[in-house]
Protein backbone atom coordinates (compact mmCIF):
# COMPACT_ATOMS: atom_id res chain seq x y z
CA UNK A 1 0.00 0.00 0.00
CA UNK A 2 1.23 3.50 -0.81
CA UNK A 3 0.90 4.60 2.81
CA UNK A 4 3.26 1.84 3.92
CA UNK A 5 5.82 3.18 1.45
CA UNK A 6 5.64 6.63 3.05
CA UNK A 7 3.23 8.27 0.62
CA UNK A 8 0.28 10.30 1.93
CA UNK A 9 -2.85 8.43 0.88
CA UNK A 10 -6.50 9.40 0.41
CA UNK A 11 -9.19 6.98 -0.73
CA UNK A 12 -12.40 7.95 -2.51
CA UNK A 13 -15.50 5.85 -3.14
CA UNK A 14 -19.14 6.52 -3.93
CA UNK A 15 -20.38 3.77 -1.59
CA UNK A 16 -20.73 4.49 2.13
CA UNK A 17 -20.78 0.72 2.76
CA UNK A 18 -17.47 0.16 0.97
CA UNK A 19 -15.99 3.19 2.71
CA UNK A 20 -16.98 1.75 6.10
CA UNK A 21 -15.22 -1.52 5.22
CA UNK A 22 -12.13 0.35 4.04
CA UNK A 23 -12.01 2.44 7.22
CA UNK A 24 -12.18 -0.68 9.38
CA UNK A 25 -9.37 -2.35 7.42
CA UNK A 26 -7.18 0.76 7.12
CA UNK A 27 -7.94 3.22 9.94
CA UNK A 28 -4.73 5.14 9.18
CA UNK A 29 -6.01 6.22 5.73
CA UNK A 30 -8.28 9.19 5.07
CA UNK A 31 -11.34 7.98 3.14
CA UNK A 32 -13.94 10.31 1.63
CA UNK A 33 -17.23 9.81 -0.17
CA UNK A 34 -16.90 11.40 -3.62
CA UNK A 35 -18.59 10.68 -6.94
CA UNK A 36 -17.11 10.55 -10.42
CA UNK A 37 -17.00 12.39 -12.69
CA UNK A 38 -17.08 15.50 -10.49
CA UNK A 39 -15.19 14.50 -7.34
CA UNK A 40 -16.67 17.69 -5.87
CA UNK A 41 -14.54 19.32 -3.20
CA UNK A 42 -11.27 17.77 -4.38
CA UNK A 43 -8.73 20.39 -5.44
CA UNK A 44 -7.03 20.35 -8.83
CA UNK A 45 -3.30 19.55 -8.83
CA UNK A 46 -3.49 18.06 -5.32
CA UNK A 47 -2.01 14.58 -5.96
CA UNK A 48 1.30 13.25 -7.23
CA UNK A 49 -0.30 9.98 -8.32
CA UNK A 50 -3.88 8.82 -8.82
CA UNK A 51 -4.77 5.13 -8.82
CA UNK A 52 -8.17 4.19 -10.25
CA UNK A 53 -8.28 0.41 -10.20
CA UNK A 54 -11.24 -1.28 -11.95
CA UNK A 55 -13.74 1.52 -11.29
CA UNK A 56 -14.64 3.21 -14.57
CA UNK A 57 -16.30 0.11 -16.04
CA UNK A 58 -19.04 0.64 -13.43
CA UNK A 59 -19.84 4.15 -14.73
CA UNK A 60 -22.39 5.00 -17.41
CA UNK A 61 -20.63 5.22 -20.78
CA UNK A 62 -21.10 9.00 -21.02
CA UNK A 63 -19.23 9.52 -17.71
CA UNK A 64 -16.07 7.56 -18.59
CA UNK A 65 -14.27 10.30 -20.56
CA UNK A 66 -15.18 13.13 -18.15
CA UNK A 67 -14.11 10.96 -15.19
CA UNK A 68 -10.69 10.27 -16.71
CA UNK A 69 -10.24 13.96 -17.55
CA UNK A 70 -11.17 14.90 -13.98
CA UNK A 71 -8.67 12.43 -12.53
CA UNK A 72 -5.94 13.96 -14.72
CA UNK A 73 -6.85 17.40 -13.37
CA UNK A 74 -6.11 16.18 -9.83
CA UNK A 75 -2.44 15.57 -10.71
CA UNK A 76 0.44 17.94 -10.18
CA UNK A 77 2.68 18.57 -13.21
CA UNK A 78 4.53 15.31 -13.96
CA UNK A 79 2.00 13.38 -11.83
CA UNK A 80 0.91 9.94 -13.02
CA UNK A 81 -2.52 8.38 -13.44
CA UNK A 82 -2.67 4.60 -12.99
CA UNK A 83 -5.95 3.45 -14.52
CA UNK A 84 -7.46 0.04 -15.17
CA UNK A 85 -10.83 -1.39 -16.09
CA UNK A 86 -12.26 -4.81 -16.70
CA UNK A 87 -12.96 -5.33 -20.39
CA UNK A 88 -16.60 -6.20 -21.04
CA UNK A 89 -17.43 -7.56 -24.49
CA UNK A 90 -20.79 -7.12 -26.19
CA UNK A 91 -23.33 -5.14 -24.22
CA UNK A 92 -23.55 -3.73 -20.71
CA UNK A 93 -24.45 -6.23 -18.02
CA UNK A 94 -24.90 -6.59 -14.29
CA UNK A 95 -23.35 -9.31 -12.15
CA UNK A 96 -25.16 -11.31 -9.47
CA UNK A 97 -24.50 -8.52 -6.94
CA UNK A 98 -26.12 -5.95 -9.23
CA UNK A 99 -22.88 -4.21 -10.21
CA UNK A 100 -22.95 -2.59 -13.63
CA UNK A 101 -20.22 -3.54 -16.11
CA UNK A 102 -20.26 -1.14 -19.05
CA UNK A 103 -19.00 -2.33 -22.43
CA UNK A 104 -17.44 0.99 -23.42
CA UNK A 105 -15.01 1.84 -26.17
CA UNK A 106 -11.57 2.57 -24.72
CA UNK A 107 -11.18 5.43 -27.20
CA UNK A 108 -13.11 7.64 -24.71
CA UNK A 109 -10.28 7.04 -22.24
CA UNK A 110 -7.58 7.79 -24.79
CA UNK A 111 -9.37 10.97 -25.94
CA UNK A 112 -9.55 12.15 -22.33
CA UNK A 113 -5.81 11.48 -22.01
CA UNK A 114 -4.95 13.76 -24.95
CA UNK A 115 -2.13 16.02 -23.84
CA UNK A 116 -0.82 13.49 -21.32
CA UNK A 117 2.09 11.17 -22.04
CA UNK A 118 0.82 7.58 -22.21
CA UNK A 119 3.43 5.39 -20.52
CA UNK A 120 1.54 2.09 -20.66
CA UNK A 121 -1.46 0.87 -22.66
CA UNK A 122 -2.05 -2.87 -22.45
CA UNK A 123 -4.59 -5.60 -21.87
CA UNK A 124 -3.69 -8.39 -19.46
CA UNK A 125 -5.44 -11.29 -17.80
CA UNK A 126 -5.89 -10.55 -14.10
CA UNK A 127 -4.13 -13.07 -11.88
CA UNK A 128 -6.82 -12.65 -9.21
CA UNK A 129 -10.00 -12.83 -11.33
CA UNK A 130 -8.94 -14.43 -14.61
CA UNK A 131 -10.73 -11.57 -16.43
CA UNK A 132 -9.23 -9.33 -19.12
CA UNK A 133 -8.19 -5.97 -17.68
CA UNK A 134 -7.06 -2.93 -19.66
CA UNK A 135 -4.32 -0.89 -17.97
CA UNK A 136 -3.22 2.61 -18.87
CA UNK A 137 -0.62 4.75 -17.12
CA UNK A 138 -0.33 8.37 -18.20
CA UNK A 139 1.83 11.25 -16.99
CA UNK A 140 0.75 14.87 -17.00
CA UNK A 141 3.09 17.13 -18.93
CA UNK A 142 4.78 19.99 -17.15
CA UNK A 143 7.48 20.81 -14.68
CA UNK A 144 7.50 20.70 -10.90
Task: Specify the residue positions occupied by each region the protein language model found.
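Class I (Rossmann-like) S-adenosyl-L-methionine-dependent methyltransferase catalytic domain
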Residues: 1-43, 59-66, 70, 80-144
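Conserved acidic residues
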Residues: 48
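A conserved beta-strand element that flanks and buttresses the S-adenosyl-L-methionine
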Residues: 51
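Short catalytic micro-motifs in class I SAM-dependent methyltransferases
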Residues: 54-55
Amino acid sequence: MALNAGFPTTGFDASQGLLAQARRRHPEVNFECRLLPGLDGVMNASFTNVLCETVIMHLPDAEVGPSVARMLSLLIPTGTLFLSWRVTQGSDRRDDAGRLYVAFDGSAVMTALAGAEVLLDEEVVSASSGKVVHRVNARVSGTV
